[in-house]
Amino acid sequence: MEPAREPPARARPPPPAARPAPAAPRPRSPAEAEARGPEGLLRRSGSGYEGSTSWKAALEDTTTRLLLGAIAVLLFAILVVMSILASKGCIKCETPCPEDWLLYGRKCYYFSEEPRDWNTGRQYCHTHEAALAVIQSQKELEFMFKFTRREPWIGLRRVGDDFHWVNGDPFDPDTFTISGTGECVFVEPTRLVSTECLTTRPWVCSKMAYT
């Protein structure tokens, strides 16, 4: 009987080949470094960056338009308020007297055309923030007759035995003489005349000029 044979020995696999060492990184050129930097990123983003700039410009333009619109509305409101104030009475006028009034000294005068009684003339002056004219000198009387020849009512009236101006001042007989026996006074070129208050004639209003 033959002895048992030993199985043949297995061949060992060859050891793995050694991996080559990684190559050293190649240095970047200046162009590549610039392309990888922030400016390169902006250039690569392209239209996105330009779109952001356009959006900011549009926003600034809209803001400017809104601001100009608000200024225009404010100016219009100021003009409306000034027009309303001017219609109620002159506050700061370019001329010292209203339209159709005449300036003499520091007063404005209005000479009516239609005849009315003394009280109606007084009421008209009152509604225009004035009074029937108070005459304080002969020169003032002469001025009045440069613009009227119709012997108008003035703001002088008898109260009891004495005459008083409508502004409350007493009448000075040394300045003017008064003829007639009536209560209300009108003027002639050289004197004052009293007559019945219901007599109709034109009148003269006066008030202080605007300053």
Swiss-Prot record:
Molecular functions per Gene Ontology: carbohydrate binding
Q: Which residues form the C-type lectin domain?
A: 104-206
Q: Which UniProt keywords apply?
A: Disulfide bond, Lectin, Membrane, Phosphoprotein, Transmembrane, Transmembrane helix
Stretch list, region Disordered: 1-53
Regions of biased composition (Pro residues) lie at 10-28
Membrane-topology descriptor: Single-pass membrane protein
**Which sequence positions carry the modification called Phosphoserine?**
S29
Give yes or no: UniProt keyword Cytoplasm: no
Does the keyword section mention Transmembrane? yes
Query: Cross-referenced Pfam families, in alphabetical order?
Result: Lectin_C
- Localization per Swiss-Prot or TrEMBL: Membrane
What residues form the membrane-spanning segments? 66-86
Q: What is its main location?
A: membrane
Name this protein carries in UniProt = C-type lectin domain family 2 member L
Q: Which organism is it from?
A: Rattus norvegicus
User: Which classification does the entry list for the species?
Assistant: Eukaryota, Metazoa, Chordata, Craniata, Vertebrata
